[in-house]
């Protein structure tokens, strides 16, 4: 890319990046990583697939909030951690929520982060 524009923010250090494919449709601003999927099936015994991750730099690597579809098909929110943004370790337990009184609360269905 000959010119990079940051809108309302600063550049994020060490974000994994692949250059724009030469055959990408004119005007397209997003493209898939050629090695997708980054996270394969069954990243933990209870999770069948990962969808719609929200990833940010954190400490000496990256942290992600993930929608993990459990093997029974019900989605819940999980955390993942990575040193390089490509290889991930996903927590085995779901994110624990609390209600407005600080009491433990677990939704029956937790979709996108």
Regions found by a protein language model. Name each.
Residues 1-111:
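Beta-rich carbohydrate-recognition and catalytic domains
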